[in-house]
């Protein structure tokens, strides 16, 4: 809800979220975007996220949600993005479809195709998925957008001869909007003239897109989301920051606590904070975050700063970087060991570089 309020205040009325892919292969680079491996939990979170983003679509603080990536994108062979998926109907229906059905039940406005193929047919050109299940059995009334260039990607899959062929396959299958491949823009009109694509399919796609614009109220006021004063008021609102902190605190899972070392005693005299992430602001933003050189860092608190603000006056903090965010240089190990030997407690902050996961 807060993300929608702030996004809408900045003039945004459509977000490409939630990502509701079930992820069971840790090698896949987009695991961190979703809710994990369980279809029940994934469905509950998917439903809640759609409700949070959209609220009542006509409201000024609502944004259209987009359920992605339909479907089985997270089951690509070997965890290789854009790869093939070989899956039984039972696995599809019991595990991978439920979170998407939950978004339909929540009234999600849009769907996005997956880059993968499913049993030999790319998701973007898969009539069984888009027309038979999504728009047929589930009676989805919104529209389907391709993923970035995924209509053209059907050529790379070896399923379409060229973009002209890909456009025909995609619109026939039920993909309503072409994002970035220009296959519709360059080919759809001619395909209709040649009677290779019924005009009724184009009409249906256009109707679905316009319907959602009406639902947002954009035809009544195309600038309803453009309000600089509201943007100043809503962005980094203290109540929003407080809620974000509360959500983060409630979401942390403690996997191990040997000798009951946590919570740290306020009487701890010396704490060593070691690792390349300790003073790196970017580390707190995770993957798919904008390059921090381009944003205001006023509200970014490093792990070091956070701990520094929290410990008592009688606690001494020591720091050693130890190693770089990525690479194999061990020159900093000696300093890290020395700092550790001077301390009562060591906090080690290491992890994957921000740009090592994703597509």
Q: What are these regions, as identified by a protein language model?
A:
Residues 1-359:
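Glycoside hydrolase catalytic-domain context in secreted enzymes
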